[in-house]
């Protein structure tokens, strides 16, 4: 679906516990009273940083649009001492998902998931698995994984216990560990995840230059506020995220920011 384009554009994404705002100035010149900065050829580092930012942002919004605070973040492992290739590990996960999907549907639910499959430096494969929670879902996951691999007990956390959606998106999309060839990043998601669509409208000039103000009942995460000129596109921008006061997502973000700051 095509949307009307504005010279100053605001895109707003609404989620259960947060609102994400992006403002962009697409004019040929700079803002009034300012000269547009000359666009420079970005470095490889800048390009990779921008690409990683976009990957993380896209996945974070997909997670927010399809999962809730008490859904499961699961670690699926193999028997101690067992070694497998990334290809074999992915095949195991595909079989596991096929079996788990049947169990969900028997109970009237659709399975939604995102997975990051890794093989560590010592060759031990494992899957970090985000999945929608249903009654007795932990038992179903354990039994299905055991049927496929013979392995025992997956470990479970709720999404807000793992730093919230922001931290999960960062972890799932982060680049591989360059310290060893066996640390491999590979993530995928189920096809039934709904892609969020933004509300698009004209942005006001004063909104582009002033520090954002939260809506009543919301808090702006200072670490999410970014304003300036994109070195790759040459466009002025302002991005920030508001979290609903009292939400588990806000608590998770504040706790995560505290750990990073410490």
What kind of region is each of these model predictions?
Residues 1-123, 133-262:
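Right-hand nucleic-acid polymerase module
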Residues 127-131:
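Cys/His-coordinated zinc-finger cores
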